[in-house]
Structure formats: C-alpha cells, structure tokens
Amino acid sequence: MGVKRVRRVGTTGALVAATLGASIVLTPSSASASGTWHCHGTQVKRCTMIWWDADADTFRARAKITDADGGGNYGVKVNNVRLQRYTSSTGWVTVRQADDNDGWHAISDLAGTSTIDPCAGPPNSFRAVAAFYWRGAGSGSETWHPNSATSRDC
C-alpha cells in the first residue's frame, strides 16, 4: 500500500509538472512588434513590410525572399533594403538602408534596416523597398515594393 501511494504521488506530480510545463511553453509572450507581409510571386515569393515596434515606437523596413514549395528550386537573395519616407515636398526619400550582402541562400533570405522614429518630423508615410534576386531554372531580379504605405498618427 505504501508503494502504491508513492507511485500515485509520483504520477500525480508528473502530470502536474507536465501540465504546468505545457502551459508555460504554450503561452505566447506578448510581442511588442508587428507588421504585415505584402508579397507577390508564385515560385519565388518576394515580400516587404514595415515592422512597427510598439514599445520603442519605431519603424524598420524588412524584406524576405523564399523559394516556394513545388517551385523550380531557386537560389535566392535579398539586399538593398530601404525604408522610404514620403512627404508632399520631397516625394519618396530613403531614410534607412541595409545592403545585406550575405550571398545566396538555398531556401530563403531575410533582411532589415535599422529603426527610425516615425514621429520625428512632419507627418509622413513610409514604405519598404528591396532588391530581390533568384537563380535556377530561370533567373531573375527586380526591385519591388507593394502599392501601399504605412503611417503613424503621432
């Protein structure tokens, strides 16, 4: 009877530990940064976003390129990522840039600029622009940005 009691306590303790461990692992942390990827392409996905860090109240441009599943098995790279600001007097002007010349990648590449305070200066709109490259069955390159911009109500 004493052995059964120990076994039950051990089993109960293991179940409590497993449940507690699962709840800790599965509970998402409250992320302070957010953004939405804007993508195009079928065999090679090219994407940009404005990444907003709510805690620091900053923007950065991010870009990624991915060889899509079932595609032509392309090598990919992204570089010359730019965060651009628009004002009525200057048009689109690059305010942050990341060259990110880390070479070709088998599946995907991700790059981003340093941050900027979107509230410094006059009201603005921002966009992300990047240069995308792919090689394989058919090679190509393009500098692309989505037809959208992000602004911050400061």
What are these regions (language model features)?
Residues 32-154:
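Post-signal peptide N-terminal regions of Sec-secreted extracellular proteins
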